[in-house]
């Protein structure tokens, strides 16, 4: 699933290509991609709207829309497992997994391609709070780059639970946007074993973990995200962070720090990669 850096990369691409452009029409090819309203009303709602801003909240993308200078609601998107946008010309042949296509002025088209078909879109009327329609937004914790995401906040939240620290980091109510890749990478940088109970984290470890999370996410955003399977930017280019990964996706390969083979284990149904020497189990 695309995580914060991948979604931020997409947001930047959407901003570059579609900001201030007017949507002139479109087609929904898979109705369940549109969570609300109906596919027909969704297309009507976006018709002749201009995109004023693309925002990101956790793994959600939010476009503020206007029509003739007046607010026209919010277009929300969650890529889920394999969703991706492709900016192209209308004459470009459709791929098998194209779910939504939207035409824009300037003879351009934005296509939503989703192999697994879990991605979702919403349109929120201008008189409704966005969180009342896209309810997952109300459950998100702070952004990793937000001032409120401090070491103290992190430790206070973690000390209430005995669940493994890796599992805790995947909880979007703790911090928004972190997934499997960057949880593994952050724990490695901090020297914390993924099975460490959350309530055992020391003050110093919490400080180092917060710093590692910010550093890892910043590095990945700078590299355009990570591509291990389906992620691409709007032009079809892979993310470049994968080649820099310390542990994720490197099972049995030597640790870049000490040479010990990277190990992999399952936690709550999710794979975790770690170095048994750099991240000893306490």
From Swiss-Prot:
Keyword Metal-binding attached: yes
GO terms of biological process kind: base-excision repair
Record's catalysed reaction(s): Hydrolysis of DNA containing ring-opened 7-methylguanine residues, releasing 2,6-diamino-4-hydroxy-5-(N-methyl)formamidopyrimidine; 2'-deoxyribonucleotide-(2'-deoxyribose 5'-phosphate)-2'-deoxyribonucleotide-DNA = a 3'-end 2'-deoxyribonucleotide-(2,3-dehydro-2,3-deoxyribose 5'-phosphate)-DNA + a 5'-end 5'-phospho-2'-deoxyribonucleoside-DNA + H(+)
InterPro entries: DNA_glyclase/AP_lyase_DNA-bd, DNA_glyclase_Znf_dom_DNA_BS, Formamido-pyr_DNA_Glyclase, FPG_cat, MutM-like_N-ter, Ribosomal_uS13-like_H2TH, Znf_DNA_glyclase/AP_lyase, Znf_FPG/IleRS
Protein EC: 3.2.2.23, 4.2.99.18
CDD domains cross-referenced by the UniProt entry: EcFpg-like_N (cd08966)
Superkingdom: Bacteria
Zinc finger residue ranges, FPG-type: 246-280
Active-site annotation: 2 (schiff-base intermediate with dna), 3 (proton donor), 59 (proton donor), 270 (proton donor)
This protein's record includes keyword Ribonucleoprotein: no
Gene3D superfamilies: 1.10.8.50, MutM-like, N-terminal
Residues that, per the record, bind DNA: 97, 116
GO MF entries: 8-oxo-7,8-dihydroguanine DNA N-glycosylase activity; class I DNA-(apurinic or apyrimidinic site) endonuclease activity; damaged DNA binding; zinc ion binding
Cofactor info, note text: Binds 1 zinc ion per subunit.
Entry-linked SMART domains: Fapy_DNA_glyco (SM00898), H2TH (SM01232)
Record keywords, A-Z: DNA damage, DNA repair, DNA-binding, Glycosidase, Hydrolase, Lyase, Metal-binding, Multifunctional enzyme, Zinc, Zinc-finger
Cofactor: Zn(2+)
Quaternary structure and partners: Monomer.
Family indicated by similarity: Belongs to the FPG family.
Purpose: Involved in base excision repair of DNA damaged by oxidation or by mutagenic agents. Acts as a DNA glycosylase that recognizes and removes damaged bases. Has a preference for oxidized purines, such as 7,8-dihydro-8-oxoguanine (8-oxoG). Has AP (apurinic/apyrimidinic) lyase activity and introduces nicks in the DNA strand. Cleaves the DNA backbone by beta-delta elimination to generate a single-strand break at the site of the removed base with both 3'- and 5'-phosphates.
UniProt name for this protein: Formamidopyrimidine-DNA glycosylase
Organism, scientific name: Synechococcus sp. (strain ATCC 27144 / PCC 6301 / SAUG 1402/1)
